């Protein structure tokens, strides 16, 4: 009877949500003369042995952040573009994707553009981690170094491009309760020196994810993506990587479950609409209990305004219909819902005043 299986599906989704929060998925595109094609890696031990030392090290750096898995697509060493890799990743549910350690400015920009298109299409929601690309887009993390071009790990120096896999792995491995802000990169021993913190502040405000010497170690300055222009859709809070990750997760889980368990499987009655709403509310409540979204702030209901407009477009006169009548009206195959959630940020800015007696 009704849609109890939808409720079960959302419950299952909430459990998997917790798992995603503690270990996301990374996509890496590399070029190599060996091991062409796709590889799904669960640990450094599964990295193809015949890859070049640089490529193996690049993949290893992703695992420093403890992602759940790393999807690697190996292009021929002479490949001039990422077309074949894009075909592989077109429907893969990955959280962060980066290009090869020698990625050019053109390819980095192209990867950012590809991700933007995929996010707009709505089927998958990856985030690109690229070096020195001014994308002004929430789906791109622009990894930069302030005041120089290389960071040091002992005696070895790396460019931002060579360290994008490390950043992608770190971001993917974060629990959704925390942000990337001030997360340490313990292996990094030095970054370019800057004259003052204001220089770092300016870089962050320009949409750069940068490293910062906190005095006790090298950390991520603030967990931001490249979005700088705020709109009604791309709001101020979506500059934060953490906020976007939770929003993407909710969008994906709800969409997947509706497509799998609801679309085409039940009559579009008012009662079934209400059961779907109840299922979504149950899912959101579990996310509230995990601390991803604010408690008692989640709303999901029939969108009366859109439903009324739809009815009018089909020739139904709604002038004498109250809101409840509109909610219960026959809308063919269409379902119009609306909702809101309050995604919780992490503690990042603290102002303390202590009075001495």
Question: In which residue ranges do the predicted regions lie?
Answer:
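Structured, hydrophobic secondary-structure cores that serve as assembly/anchoring elements
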Residues: 1-61, 67, 213-357
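A glycine- and small-residue-enriched flexible loop/hinge signal that marks low-structured segments
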Residues: 2, 10-13, 25-33, 87-260, ...
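Well-ordered, non-membrane alpha-helical segments in soluble/globular domains
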Residues: 52-58, 80-84, 106-118, 276
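Intrinsic-disorder/low-complexity loop/linker signature
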Residues: 37-38, 68-71, 148, 155
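A short, well-structured beta->alpha microelement
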Residues: 70-87
């Amino acid at each position: 009877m009704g849609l109890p299986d939808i409720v079960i599906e959302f419950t299952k989704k909430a459990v998997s949500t917790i798992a995603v929060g503690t270990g996301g998925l990374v996509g890496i595109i590399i070029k190599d003369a060996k091991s062409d094609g796709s590889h799904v890696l669960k640990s450094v031990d599964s990295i193809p042995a015949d890859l070049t030392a640089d490529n193996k090290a690049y993949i290893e750096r992703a695992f420093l952040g403890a992602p759940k898995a790393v999807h690697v697509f190996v292009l021929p060493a002479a490949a001039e573009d990422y077309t074949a890799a894009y075909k592989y990743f077109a429907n893969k549910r990955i959280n962060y994707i980066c290009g090869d350690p020698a990625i050019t400015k053109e390819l980095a920009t192209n990867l950012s553009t590809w991700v933007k298109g995929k996010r707009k299409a709505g089927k998958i929601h990856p985030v690109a981690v690229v070096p020195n690309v001014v994308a002004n887009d929430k789906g791109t993390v622009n990894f930069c170094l302030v005041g120089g071009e290389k960071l040091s790990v002992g005696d070895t120096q790396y460019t931002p491009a060579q360290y994008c896999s490390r950043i992608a792995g770190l971001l993917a491995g974060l629990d959704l309760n925390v942000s990337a802000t001030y997360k340490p990169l313990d292996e990094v021993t030095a970054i370019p020196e800057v004259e003052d913190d204001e220089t770092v502040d300016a870089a962050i405000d320009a949409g750069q994810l940068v490293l910062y010497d906190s005095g006790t170690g090298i950390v991520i300055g603030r967990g931001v993506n490249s979005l700088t222009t705020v709109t009604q859709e791309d709001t101020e809070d979506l500059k934060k990587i953490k906020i976007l990750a939770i929003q993407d997760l909710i969008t994906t889980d709800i969409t997947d479950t509706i497509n799998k368990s609801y679309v085409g499987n039940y009559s579009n009655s008012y009662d079934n609409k209400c059961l779907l709403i109840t299922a979504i509310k149950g899912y959101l409540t579990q996310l509230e209990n995990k601390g991803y979204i604010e408690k008692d702030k989640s709303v999901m209901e029939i969108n009366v305004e859109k439903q009324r407009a739809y009815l009018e477009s089909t020739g139904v006169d709604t002038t004498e219909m109250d809101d409840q009548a509109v909610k219960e009206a026959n809308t063919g195959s269409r379902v119009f819902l609306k909702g809101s959630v309050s995604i919780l940020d992490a503690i990042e800015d603290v102002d303390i005043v202590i009075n001495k007696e």
